[in-house]
Amino acid sequence: MFVTWRLAGTLPQVPAEVFRRDPHPGRFFLAQDRRLDSTPQGPRWLQDPRIARVVAEALAYGERVRRAYDLFAWVILPNHVHLVLRPQRTLSAILRWLKSATATRANRVLGKTGEAFWQREYFDHWIRSEKELASVVAYLEANPVKAGSEYTGGKTAGATQDHAALRKNVETPGSYRTHSGGRRT
């Protein structure tokens, strides 16, 4: 599954007629994503290496400790995150946890309170073939370059990781542990 979510305040209002012009949601997504990569609208907190690391560590924790998904590839850009994963739980539960855990820690790092960190909605697309998987992963690998982000590895913004590199480069933080139903998850 391919998933994208954005920082709050980074999506401009799009008139409904834009959606009617191109009925293919994938094409519309790619065009919008490329346009939004280069727009300065809204916050760009993910370009801060401390905040990008918060997200990267949560991704690793969600896979290794929570076992919520198998993570194949990911990229953190200045105002949004792309993932390719195989969910082991419902996508809504995965994203609810990821966004909540990362927003709490990122807001603490930034000294922010009382305002949304992430956009409420997210984009998801089921990957239906090996060919499509290769295409989506290639898109993620090229995305930081096309967006003008600096590629610096798994610990900072603009980092694309494959499964093995993720395990090697990102430590699993203990601070993502949560409680659910009286037992540690």
Task: Label each PLM-derived region with a short phrase.
Residues M1-T185:
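Short catalytic/metal-binding and nucleic-acid-binding patches
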